[in-house]
Amino acid sequence: MKQYLQLCQRIVDEGQWVENKRTGTRCLTVINADLEYDVANNQFPMITTRKSYYKAAIAELLGYLRGYDSAAQFREIGCKTWDANANENSAWLNNPHRKGEDDMGRVYGVQGRAWQRPDGSTLDQLAKVINNLKNGIDDRGEIISFYNPGEFELGCLRPCMHTHTFSLLGDTLYLTSIQRSCDVPLGLNFNQIQCFVLLALVAQITGHKAGKAYHKITNAHIYENQLELMRDVQLKREPFASPQLKINPNIKSLNDIETWVTRDDFEVTGYECHEAIQYPFSV
């Protein structure tokens, strides 16, 4: 929690204004932020200086791991975060590749589970990584990338957190996640929860201990219409201790994740927080 607040304060103190053409809203921006999450000691990185939610973030991650390409699929598992980008993004609405209401196109999990090869076949990056890790293999390329510039026009949004690299040292598994852009007041709570859960979950289904998850953000920003709430409200609050996460121990395979796991198989305990803050979202 402390590192989150330090990043927010850094943006307020040192950030430079950048015009964002996609949203039409200016951002106060810094370059390069490095965060880390102690998964081994179960220090769950959920924001405590405002009321935050974790189940939608986990549901979104499950949708990515399943390769979902429709906002309707995400809604069915308890996540509404793709409704706006699928149905209110003017550039995507006018894109001839859009297949209709709720279509997201070839974004995030589609790339992770069905990366197009030149011969027309697809590569399941996630399955490759899981199979290697289950067999104790780290080829220094246990990487899942959602970032496919050749297909950006086929999706509603370029991936923000785009690359996840797993590293195995002995029986301890580590994760390094790279993010090109982060809406810190709104998006980072989701992102850091997903980094933590991704490592914890993959460690569980591959039979390893979880170590640390490292999270590198290139462009960290606060939108102009969020600044006052961040500076004058959230940063004035004292954080509470980190909560802990419980994962259903019956989740033992990628097939389990694909077939029956829900957001209710994850439970946060010991969460204390301040009152909610309603930050505006820029589409």
Curated annotation (Swiss-Prot):
Keywords: Cytoplasm, Methyltransferase, Nucleotide biosynthesis, Transferase
Gene3D superfamilies: Thymidylate synthase/dCMP hydroxymethylase domain
GO biological process: dTMP biosynthetic process; dTTP biosynthetic process; methylation
Entry keyword Cytoplasm: yes
Coiled-coil zones: none
A Gene Ontology molecular function term of the record: thymidylate synthase activity
Binding positions for dUMP per the UniProt entry: R22, R180, S181, C182, D183, N191, H221, I222, Y223
Disulphide-bonded residues: none
EC number: 2.1.1.45
Annotated compartments: Cytoplasm
Pfam entry (one): Thymidylat_synt
PANTHER family on file: THYMIDYLATE SYNTHASE, THYMIDYLATE SYNTHASE 1
Role, per record: Catalyzes the reductive methylation of 2'-deoxyuridine-5'-monophosphate (dUMP) to 2'-deoxythymidine-5'-monophosphate (dTMP) while utilizing 5,10-methylenetetrahydrofolate (mTHF) as the methyl donor and reductant in the reaction, yielding dihydrofolate (DHF) as a by-product. This enzymatic reaction provides an intracellular de novo source of dTMP, an essential precursor for DNA biosynthesis.
Family per record: Belongs to the thymidylate synthase family. Bacterial-type ThyA subfamily.
Assembly behavior: Homodimer.
Name this polypeptide is given: Thymidylate synthase
Biological source species: Pseudoalteromonas translucida (strain TAC 125)
